[in-house]
Design a protein with these regions (language model features):
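Accessory alpha/beta interaction modules
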Residues: 1-165, 175
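Short, hydrophobic/amphipathic alpha-helical patches that form generic packing surfaces
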Residues: 10-14, 168-171, 184-188
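Short, charged alpha-helical interaction segments and adjacent helix-coil junctions
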Residues: 2, 66, 71-76, 173, ...
Length: 281
């Protein structure tokens, strides 16, 4: 019988930052990247510190692996039209913040951007997309390759290995038909359940650690409240309270304030900051 498990976004916020639970993230990454990944630490920055004022629909975490690569996980629940731009900004910020001013450019670390989205982002029939950087000749259409000195310098064989690597998992586009271990993980991300036949790395640990029935009473109440807030926000996006111009969102916030809606809920629903909403009073 399939157990009801905790949503992955909540798990990242509350559970998977603990070292004893790294095995779950390591399993997911190993299946996605098709290589053995070991996480050595979770890094804190202004973007991923615990903050109750943050938008409910976005969760992120920054990790560092045994190869000193940076891995940023981001889970986006509701629609965001400029999401691709935010992915680019996030990766650029990690690179600039983590490189010492006196460091050589060759010391720039590899960054993996893992994006789990629960909305229909762009046109495409697949549910897992990978983005890399390569250079092709405008006249000969040949692919630029590293020479032997560069391979030794970077310790990479291909140019694309130097640049950030992007993954987008469109969870809601998955048809629940599992064909490999990565599909088993996506099934879990979509349904919060693990089938007895699944064998993907990290899923058995996820089944054990993320069992809803094993949550303490206070923790369960907070989790249920989180789910309620997500459902409320989703309903707001589906209605006229969705993404719009800043003037429209300000007007919506004013109306919600008049009707006694809590400021944090207004912030989550409109994308406005707490300070912007307080200024409307």
């Amino acid at each position: 019988m399939e157990k009801q498990l905790i949503r992955f976004d909540w798990a990242i916020k509350k559970i998977l930052r603990q070292k004893e639970n790294f095995v779950i993230l390591e399993g997911f990454l190993s299946e996605l990247l098709k290589e053995d990944i070991t996480i050595i630490e979770i890094l804190e920055s202004e973007s991923n510190k615990e903050n109750e004022k943050r938008k409910l629909n976005r969760v992120d975490i920054l990790a560092k692996d045994n190869k000193e690569s940076y891995i940023v996980f981001e889970i986006q629940v509701t629609k965001e039209l400029d999401y691709l731009s935010r992915i680019l900004f996030g990766v650029s910020k990690i690179i600039s913040e983590r490189l010492n001013r006196s460091a050589k450019y060759e010391e720039v670390k590899k960054v993996y951007s893992i994006n789990i989205v629960y909305f229909d982002m762009g046109h495409g029939v697949d549910y897992v997309y990978r983005g890399t950087t390569n250079f092709y000749g405008l006249h000969k259409n040949d692919k630029l390759e590293l020479n032997e000195q560069q391979k030794k310098l970077y310790d990479y064989e291909r140019i694309e290995e130097i640049f950030p690597e992007y993954y987008i998992l469109k969870v809601d586009s998955f048809d629940d038909n599992t064909k490999d271990n990565l599909d088993e993980w996506i099934y879990f991300l979509k349904n919060e359940k693990v089938k007895d036949t699944f064998s993907a790395r990290g899923l058995r640990e996820a089944e054990e650690k993320l069992n809803v029935l094993k949550m303490k009473e206070e923790e369960r109440r907070k989790y249920d409240r989180y789910l309620d807030e997500l459902r409320y926000e989703a309903s707001m996006v589906d209605s006229s309270y969705g993404i719009g111009r800043i003037e429209e969102r300000l007007e919506i916030a004013k109306n919600l304030l008049k009707n006694g809606v809590p400021i944090d809920v207004i912030s989550a629903s409109t994308g406005l900051s707490i300070e912007e909403i307080i200024a409307l009073k």
